[in-house]
Amino acid sequence: MTRDLLVDPDALREQVRGKYREVAVDPGASFHFHTGRGLAARLGYEAAVAGALPDQAVESFAGVGNPFSLRRLTPGERVVDVGSGAGFDSFIAAGQVGPGGHVVGVDMTPEMLAKSRQTAAALGLAHVQFRHGLAESLPVDDCWADVVISNGVINLCADKHAVFAEIFRVLRPGGRLQFADIANGRPVPDGALRDIDLWTA
């Protein structure tokens, strides 16, 4: 099915990628959103869990909620993290599913992927993998995941129908989605939807 999108998805992706490249390279810079350990604490992440992760995994965290507040993951589960960034939620997921589980983080920003991969190697986590890809075309097999998590990512995608279709595709029958995101309960004017700068403002 073809949908008329009011913003160019490729142009929007490039804008978003540029913003999160900055967050990866210079996480201490000033952004219009919060980042790091202080943000994780405000969002209700367990202090002991976040505190056990190295700075590299936490400093570029820019989520909007806590997908684990919905339900704790079960040992042995297979998890896909859509828009995994520097890996903060992926590493928490890895701790919850244990070495018998598996976590695949997917992100489109090379600088974020580099950080997450370096951290996974430093922590010796063989059951965590980070792949380059888009939320609209996840590099994951059909029906692979028990759980899909995401944090503050879907609102930045122009074609949300495509994102949710991909999530449905990679989830096994009976699997679940645990995500945190930004939602607007009122219609957004077309002019605002066409303004790429407003998507990341």
Segments (PLM) and residue ranges:
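Conserved alpha-helix/loop element of class I SAM-dependent methyltransferases that forms part
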Residues: 33-78, 88-96
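Conserved SAM-binding strand-loop segment of SAM-dependent methyltransferases
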Residues: 123-137
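A short acidic, Gly/Pro-enriched loop at the edge of an enzyme's catalytic core
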Residues: 75, 136-147
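N-terminal auxiliary segments of SAM/dcSAM-dependent transferases
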Residues: 1-43
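Short, glycine-/aromatic-enriched active-site segment of Class I SAM-dependent methyltransferases
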Residues: 182-201
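A short glycine-rich, Lys/Arg-flanked "PGG" loop and its adjoining helix->strand segment in the class I
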Residues: 95, 161-176
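Conserved SAM-binding loop
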Residues: 116-117
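Conserved SAM/SAH-binding beta-strand->alpha-helix loop
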Residues: 109-111
